[in-house]
Design a protein with these regions (language model features):
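Cytosolic, long alpha-helical scaffolding segments
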Residues: 1-187
Length: 187
């Protein structure tokens, strides 16, 4: 549990929101002042959507920071959320690199990796629920309440990590649309 990093992420959300608003304004100004067509219009439209995905990733990261600070102890050692976290961070980084390089093949690869992340999230959620069902040995109401809070927090963590992966796929899909005018990954 890295509380310093959690605080850094939470405190960085305001800056991300400010950047989002600045970039959104830039996109609107370009649309209004330049009246782009074809590839330029797709570039601005894709960028407009991508900055929304990045802002939402920032919001999810803030949630994850909050969950980290709220967690009192690791009650589910069989669930490796760090592995899922590493996978989705790599997906976001690769999606942004694909955008910058206009790399169509990387876009498809990112979408393919999302299936593995979804499977990891499903497996992790199943481990949590199975563990909860098998416990049944909490003797006090306080222990039951603490376990329920731990379960809820961990399931939210898993869900938010999975959503970060989905936003990485959205970025890849918008990039594919921008480069190839191909909406294959959008739907």
């Amino acid at each position: 549990k890295d509380e310093d990093l959690a605080w850094e992420v939470i405190e960085g959300d305001h800056e991300i929101n400010e950047l989002y608003l600045d970039l959104e304004k830039d996109c609107i100004d370009l649309l209004a002042l330049q009246q782009p067509v074809a590839g330029d219009l797709r570039f601005i439209a894709a960028s407009f959507k991508i900055i929304t995905d990045l802002e939402r990733i920032g919001d999810l990261a803030t949630n994850l920071g909050d969950y980290t600070l709220d967690a009192e102890h690791d009650v589910f050692p069989d669930v490796d959320v760090q592995e899922i976290g590493v996978a989705v961070v790599e997906m976001v980084e690769d999606a942004m690199e694909a955008y910058a390089a206009e790399d169509v093949e990387a876009c498809y690869a990112i979408a393919d990796r999302d299936d593995a992340v979804d499977a990891m999230c499903e497996d992790a959620s199943e481990v949590v629920v199975r563990d909860l069902l098998e416990r049944g040995d909490e003797t006090t109401e306080a222990e039951v309440q603490q376990t329920m809070q731990d379960v809820y927090r961990l399931l939210l963590t898993i869900r938010d990590l999975e959503r970060v992966g989905d936003h990485a796929v959205n970025i890849a899909a918008r990039t594919l649309y921008m480069v190839e005018n191909d909406d294959d990954l959008l739907y």
